Curated annotation (Swiss-Prot):
GO terms for cellular component: cytoplasm. Major role in the synthesis of nucleoside triphosphates other than ATP. The ATP gamma phosphate is transferred to the NDP beta phosphate via a ping-pong mechanism, using a phosphorylated active-site intermediate. Pfam families: NDK. GO terms for molecular function: ATP binding; metal ion binding; nucleoside diphosphate kinase activity. Its cofactor is Mg(2+). Keywords: ATP-binding, Cytoplasm, Kinase, Magnesium, Metal-binding, Nucleotide metabolism, Nucleotide-binding, Phosphoprotein, Transferase. This is Nucleoside diphosphate kinase. It comes from Aeropyrum pernix (strain ATCC 700893 / DSM 11879 / JCM 9820 / NBRC 100138 / K1). SMART domains: NDK (SM00562). Gene3D superfamilies: Nucleoside diphosphate kinase-like domain.
């Protein structure tokens, strides 16, 4: 097994609904480590950079509007196969199709307001991490 890092972001709808603790608890109960975490409000520029892979998609503008509509909580999660483990933990992007027991399956009925974002690959993590964090914010433990 390979120890990896991945990014997990509680989106504005998750923050507004008071689900930060729920998300953190699920990460910890799974045996993963949070090595960086902060609350922030993304600027339009940061949001566009963060979601740059979707720039040419029809939903890009709506996605940027939503992610900048309120605070988010971003965390770097570390553990064995962290990218795939966290993706399984959060469930399908479309909350209506996400399995019960997953974060989105338990708390979302929407494809946009789906509580959380998580990196979909180690390469995505590297790009997304550079937008939201610096290496000095990682706490080794």
């Amino acid at each position: 097994m390979a120890v990896q890092r991945t990014l997990l972001v509680v989106k504005p709808d998750g923050v507004e609904r008071g689900l930060i603790g729920e998300v953190v608890s699920r990460v910890e109960r799974k045996g993963l480590k949070i090595v960086a975490m902060k609350m922030m409000r993304l600027t339009r520029e940061k949001a566009e950079e963060f979601y740059s892979v979707h720039r040419d998609k029809p939903f890009f503008g709506e996605l940027v509007e939503f992610i900048t509509s309120g605070p988010v909580v971003a965390m770097v999660v570390e553990g064995d196969e962290a990218v795939s483990v966290v993706r399984l933990m959060i469930g399908s992007t479309d909350g209506r199709k996400a399995a019960p027991g997953t974060i989105r399956g338990d708390f979302s009925l929407d494809i946009m307001k789906n509580i959380v974002h998580a990196s979909d690959s180690p390469e995505s993590f590297e790009r997304e991490f550079r937008v939201l964090f610096s290496e000095s914010e990682i706490v080794e433990w």
